Amino acid sequence: MSFEEEEEEETFEHTLLVVREVSVYKIPPRTTSGGYKCGEWLQSDKIWSGRLRVVSCKDRCEIRLEDSNSGDLFAACFVDPGRRENSVEPSLDSSRYFVLRIDDGRGKYAFIGLGFAERNEAFDFNVALSDHEKYVRREKEKETGETSESDNHIDIHPAVNHRLKEGETIRINVKPKPTTNGTGMLSAALSGTGKPKPLALAPPPKAAGVTRSPLPPPPNDPVASRIASDGCKESRRNEPLSDLSQLKKNLPSTAGSGSSKSTGAASGWAAF
């Protein structure tokens, strides 16, 4: 490989994320080992605002803070594989703020506060860093897999011909399965010489002796009205109290008794 190809391979970069506007703060020194809180950062401590780019350079990931107009580099944070927590630390009281460890490339470093305007931008920032870690892990697994396959190479013997030659046969002994009780009873019933007796079924229940009443005739039917009048006459003829002429003959006359009572009363009054 020539020197130019090595230089191109070293300078190969892949941009993972671009955020147009971020803010950088001068943060006070950490007093406890718990972490940083963005609530302690003052608005007057804001020292810079510009563009953020997350760039993948082979195994290393770089967080670059650049000028939005000119593209000049303000600061850079280098994230080594497997050591993300040493370079990028999230704030304890907000998901939009982080603390970056910036390096000048000569062994000097400092800690600054990084703030995103929107929560989804901070989420994309975390996703970009995680994607780079996964990419580096896959590349390492691929390299180790290739080396292990080359070291553990096994010669495969040619396939053996197991086909039968002319005149050869195969004998297979099959053990009969034991019959269960249900299948034995069924087979015994089917193998019997006698004819199977038909099942005696009970006769269906008789219908109840209920007769339906005939439908009434229409009200204006002349035949129905004539039958009704004849029936009324017949019923009156058969009633014992319908003819009272015989009783009137046997009853005493009320006219004579009434006249006798009236004459007796009159005579009694005159005598008084």
UniProtKB/Swiss-Prot annotation:
Residues 243-252 have a biased composition (Polar residues). SUPFAM superfamilies: PH domain-like. Disulfide bonds: none annotated. GO terms for cellular component: membrane. GO terms for molecular function: ATPase-coupled transmembrane transporter activity. Residues 136-156, 231-240 have a biased composition (Basic and acidic residues). Residues 253-272 have a biased composition (Low complexity). InterPro entries: NECAP_PHear (IPR012466), PH-like_dom_sf (IPR011993). This is Uncharacterized protein At1g03900. It comes from Arabidopsis thaliana (Mouse-ear cress).
